[in-house]
């Protein structure tokens, strides 16, 4: 995990809400829009990237970053050396994020951003639906988060003309979907876009810092280190083993839909819970209800007849 503290103490960006994190709620944040972008309807470019798609611990964070089209290279690449967040050190990422959040700095006055932090609970509840038809897989969740961020920025009045997005899947298919949703923008979807386009590099930094600090907030009251949160990290696996509750598993930090977590619950002492199928009586048809009422009415009539005596036949006379 990245060290989020510096000489001034811990830094908590506005993209982080500790109460939401600790309660397992997904959260979305939109930064204030630089006034000049709205004043003259400045053409802007926008980049989207994510952090935390693969880990079993912590949120998956999507970030959208925008600024005037003419400033993308000179401000982001040449002056501040934005790059793929994985290439930059934690200290450099944190410094860039702090400047972005500090008033009267060049980044703050010319750039805007938004984040969508999908909580482990939200991710897992979508992926673990009872039927396949109801499953809300990770790709669908990622696509919806991306679209919601871009729409939100458009709705706030930003004149986005060019959109650049990093993708893991097939760029062409992803791009066609987005072009149908945003037909007026020039859209570029590419693998490794975070190292090709400065505006995507900036989005990757915002997403990465937000996720790193989210992990720190989730870990704050714990003593055993959990590493990066990836299933391939031995510290992460050890933490999961040592902190698994046999009934409830783990807290809001864990994605229960990940194979690492599911296998551990099934093979390392987790208590199996059987959920009974719904009985037919609970889904009784309306016609069955009226049939039952009719049968009961016939019984009531018969009972009334015997109360006054059995009917006399011809043979009685």
Curated annotation (Swiss-Prot):
GO BP term, example: mismatch repair
Family to which this protein belongs: Belongs to the RNase HII family. Eukaryotic subfamily.
A Pfam family reported for this protein in Swiss-Prot or TrEMBL: RNase_HII
Cofactor binding note from Swiss-Prot or TrEMBL: Manganese or magnesium. Binds 1 divalent metal ion per monomer in the absence of substrate. May bind a second metal ion after substrate binding.
One GO CC term, this protein: ribonuclease H2 complex
Gene Ontology MF terms: metal ion binding; RNA binding; RNA-DNA hybrid ribonuclease activity
Cofactor: Mn(2+); Mg(2+)
Top-level taxon: Eukaryota
Residues reported to bind a divalent metal cation: 49-50, 166
Keyword entries, A-Z: Endonuclease, Hydrolase, Metal-binding, Nuclease
PANTHER family listed in its UniProt record: RIBONUCLEASE H2 SUBUNIT A
Annotated EC: 3.1.26.4
Protein name stated in the entry: Ribonuclease H2 subunit A
InterPro entries documented for this protein: RNase_H2_suA, RNase_HII/HIII, RNase_HII/HIII_dom, RNase_HII_hlx-loop-hlx_cap_dom, RNaseH-like_sf, RNaseH_sf
Catalytic activity reported: Endonucleolytic cleavage to 5'-phosphomonoester
Domain RNase H type-2: 43-270
Function: Endonuclease that specifically degrades the RNA of RNA-DNA hybrids. Participates in DNA replication.
């Amino acid at each position: 995990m990245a060290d989020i503290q510096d000489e001034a103490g811990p830094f908590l960006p506005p993209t982080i809400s500790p109460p939401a994190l600790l309660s397992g709620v997904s959260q979305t944040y939109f930064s204030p829009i630089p006034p000049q972008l709205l004043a003259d309807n400045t053409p802007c470019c926008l980049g989207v990237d994510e952090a935390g798609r693969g880990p079993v611990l912590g949120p998956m964070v999507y970030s959208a970053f925008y600024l005037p089209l003419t400033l993308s290279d000179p401000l982001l690449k040449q002056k501040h050396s934005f790059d793929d967040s994985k290439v930059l050190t934690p200290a450099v990422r944190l410094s860039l994020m702090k400047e972005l959040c500090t008033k009267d700095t060049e980044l703050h006055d010319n750039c805007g951003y938004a984040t969508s932090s999908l909580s482990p609970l939200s991710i897992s509840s979508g992926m673990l639906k009872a039927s396949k038809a109801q499953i809300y897989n990770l790709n669908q969740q990622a696509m919806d988060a991306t679209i919601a961020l871009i729409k939100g920025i458009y709705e706030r009045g930003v004149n986005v003309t060019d959109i650049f997005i990093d993708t893991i899947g097939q760029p062409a298919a992803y791009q066609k979907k987005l072009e149908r949703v945003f037909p007026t923008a020039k859209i570029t979807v590419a693998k490794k876009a975070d190292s090709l386009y400065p505006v995507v590099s900036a989005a990757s930094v915002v997403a990465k810092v937000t996720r790193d600090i989210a992990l720190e907030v989730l870990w704050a009251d714990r003593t055993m280190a959990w590493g990066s949160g990836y299933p391939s990290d031995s510290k992460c696996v050890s933490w999961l083993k040592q902190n698994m509750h046999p009934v409830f598993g783990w807290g809001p930090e864990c994605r229960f839909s990940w194979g690492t977590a599911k296998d551990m619950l099934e093979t390392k002492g987790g208590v199996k819970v059987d959920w009974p199928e719904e009985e037919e009586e609970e889904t009784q048809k309306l016609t069955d209800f009226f049939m039952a009422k009719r049968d009961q009415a016939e019984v009531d009539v018969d009972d009334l007849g015997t109360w006054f005596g059995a009917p006399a036949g011809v043979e009685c006379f």
